[in-house]
Amino acid sequence: MTVLAVAALSARVLAEAASEEGFDVVALDVFGDADTRRACSQWLSIAEPGGLQLDAAHLLSALEMLARRGDVAGWIAGSGFDGRPDLLERGAALLPLIGTSADALRRVRDPEAFFGFLAAEGIPHPPVQMTAPADGAGWLVKDAHGCGGWHIRRVPLQGHGDPPEVAAPVPAHHYFQREMRGEPMSATFIANGREARVLGFNQILVRPFGTRPFVFCGVLGPVPLPASVAEQVGDAVGSVAAAFSLRGLGSLDFMLDGTAFGVLEVNPRPPASLALYRQRSGQAASQWAPGGVVSAHLRACVRGELPPAPAGAGDDVANPAVAGTEIVFAPRTTHLDAAAAARLAGFAACHDLPAGATRFEAGDPVCSVTASGPDAARVCALLARGRDAVHQLLETHP
């Protein structure tokens, strides 16, 4: 059995997917949730002390230990490395990294390089500039090193004669982007450094949190797109994957307004939408990636092989089933004792379960809920029901 390490802020989905495909999994993450630990033979904390971020020293120590074991094939990096190519590079020097290289991450997360490429290729995207607009109306400021939408803010508006509030130079990895009307979407893909295969298209769920208007809360799919849009977005994915040498699982985020779309960014690592394309225990082989998406990720990275094109991917017809996952955030500071954690674990639709008594600050992720159904509307309704059930448990527990 191949031993594989997966590292991320939350490694649960990667760990479960790899385990279901027959890998012996070592999981490295921040949360150490109960279901993450069940999916792996070993769990190692890489949490920043007292925080919800990756700690470089803990990560590198864990990878060095795994390298000394001698039986770990390599590691897959998930969320949490988007703005840390140097850490990715240091980790790859200790244990083989199976995925997009640190150098490729630097380039694709450089807003001038990325949006410059889109402009040169004629790939639709919202207007972008590196300095604050004179009039902030309709503009967002983003951090190219951020993830989850927590970094996105609207540019403050100025009254007549007022000095711009965002006049000071922003860090090199920040940029300003015109807000685009439409629905936030993504394309889940697998790339081999030269080309890419789109597995499907997804609807992204976002919600405002205070001054942050577009916090990522979940994703559902695959959902159908008009054939012309699916083809154009697929071409954009292929162009970006080739230009920036992307490898393995990733996603391209875009806005969709009718038949018009605009590319927002690319996530050059296994995305949250991976959960929608997994091969689950007891089910037939995944229709999107025969043998499973983690195995397909490895084949693309190591051998350059891509899965066959999924039948009907992106067609403007109903898919046989839509899956969805949503993060449930704590609405207020909450202490979940062991009894409440056990009750939460009894909810069949809940995942990313606390391993025991846990204190959550307002805005911390408590767990996730999942659902499936015949269409996106039904899945959204089921996710809302699951979210409400978790909130009710939190509100009725001191």
Placement of each model-derived feature along the sequence:
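Peripheral (often C-terminal) accessory segments that flank ATP-dependent C-N-forming ligase machineries
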Residues: 11, 295-398
